[in-house]
A protein has these predicted regions:
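Short, polar loop motifs at secondary-structure junctions
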Residues: 11-13, 32-40, 114-119
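Short, well-formed alpha-helical segments that are part of the catalytic scaffolds
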Residues: 12-25
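Active-site acidic Asp-centered loop
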Residues: 34, 86-88
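Short aromatic/hydrophobic "clamp" motif used to bind/position activated sugar donors
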Residues: 83
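Catalytic core and acceptor-binding pocket of nucleotide-sugar-dependent glycosyltransferases
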Residues: 95-96, 104, 109-255
Length: 255
């Protein structure tokens, strides 16, 4: 796995740091966090690199700007072909599985099913809990996010009630802004001109969360966390990209 770097971004917990310190021994790991981090990095192994940055003045809605800056800071320092971005307050195992997926399908961005929303619930809403792809594509994604945050672009989305168009509202969800920024950068001639679900299937796919056990998923907005027991459909999330087209996207599989 020498051609992939794990980027751990944002606020770092001791639990997350200890987990990856124990499990990531044969490939590069970059921690991109803030100068006020209290973790002791004195015994850092040679495959780990830590970047401590000043906290941006503007957090953005749901800390979108924090995520963008910390991720981009990491991406701009790595040299590997692939990158896997995770949060500093979660952990996932079997990163070899993600690496295998990237080598088989390098053109897509591979995302976790954690709050990857159905189209009826929230258009253009991938998961930002795990984002994996080529370093080139992730740089395109987060540079576009940074540009759009700085310029105020991508702040408007459609709001639906009972599946029907209702009004335009300010986009607060970081995941929507990430998705739309990337698609606008990669496919400007198609974005918002063709069915967004088709475009999402072309550029994204969803990882199998069961293959990432043991894991810890955390939702700060809801003050909830899961250890190996996050069921996507029970949490208004989809497990496969084709569920974007489903009339019953949150039906629990095999039930």
């Amino acid at each position: 796995m020498e051609d992939v770097t794990l980027i751990i971004q944002g606020r770092l917990t001791q639990e997350t740091y200890d987990f990856y310190l124990k499990t990531c021994t044969n490939f590069p790991v970059l921690i991109s966090t803030w100068v006020d981090c209290k973790i002791d990095f004195s015994s850092l192994p040679p495959n780990f690199l830590v970047i401590l940055s000043q906290i941006p003045e503007e957090p953005g809605a749901q800390n979108f700007h924090y995520q963008t800056v910390s991720t981009l800071t990491g991406l701009e320092r790595i040299k590997t072909k692939y990158a896997i971005k995770v949060r500093g307050d979660e952990f996932y195992s079997n990163l070899q599985y993600i690496h295998n997926v990237l080598r088989v399908d390098p053109d897509k961005i591979h995302s976790a099913p954690v709050f990857f929303r159905a189209w009826q619930y929230s258009e253009y809403h991938i998961s930002d809990h795990v984002i994996a792809g080529t370093t080139e594509n992730l740089l395109i994604m987060f540079r576009a996010c940074k540009h759009n945050f700085d310029t105020g672009k991508m702040n408007v989305s459609k709001w639906k009630i009972d599946g029907n168009f209702h009004k335009y509202v300010t986009t607060h969800a970081p995941e929507e802004r990430i998705t739309k920024s990337y698609l606008d950068a990669k496919a400007p001639d198609k974005f918002e001109r063709v069915d967004g679900r088709i475009l999402m299937k072309e550029y994204f796919d969803i990882l199998d969360l069961n293959l990432l056990k043991p894991y810890k998923v955390k939702a700060n907005l809801f003050r909830v966390e899961w250890y190996d027991n996050f069921l996507p459909e029970a949490n208004y999330s989809i497990s496969t990209i084709d569920q974007l087209f489903s009339d019953d996207p949150y039906k629990i599989p095999n039930q």
